[in-house]
Amino acid sequence: MRKILALIMAALLSIVALGGCMNKGATPFDGTKGETENANDLVPTKYETVNDLEGVTMTVKGGTVSPNGLTLTIENNSDINCLYGQFFLLEKKLDDKWYEVPVTIEGDYGFEDIGYELAPGDKQEWETDWQWLYGSLDKGRYRIIKDILDFRGTGDFDTHYLAAEFTID
């Protein structure tokens, strides 16, 4: 049984690693300190459907938001097993539309290859510092997006996306 669980975890970690790799960085985000915002220069969201995994929620823990990071609470009130990793993406709301916050580093980057199990009834906190990737965020309305797997077995899972909104004052 332990060997099967180890194989399942190895397969999921590989999937998370491949999904967490991103292409080359973009220019610094219009709207970071000292720059102006222009939605024409930004990439619109790819995540039109979020928070569609019934019984699984992600919220921002009160009092943890800063221009450099925050803490999320991820809760599984369903009867399914879930897995999530280190991957996240930030978006900013401009003119009632969501746009990706471009990364501030050049070249390729990735996220730690790890999978966190979120069993039915579990509630976990996940802390992140995005300064290495996005820099310090300017004032505005943002959301953080994380992928989460509805995991049934090796090769048998569905990927969903959770989003939690927050404001930098």
Language model feature labels by segment:
Residues V16-G20:
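C-terminal motif of bacterial Sec signal peptides marking the signal peptidase cleavage site
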Residues M22-I105, A119, D147-D169:
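Primarily secretory-pathway and cell-envelope proteins
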Residues A6-L13:
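Sec-dependent N-terminal signal peptides
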Residues M1-I4:
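Positively charged n-region of N-terminal signal peptides that target proteins for export
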Residues I105-R143, D147-R152:
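Short, solvent-exposed, Trp/other aromatic-anchored flexible loops in extracytoplasmic proteins
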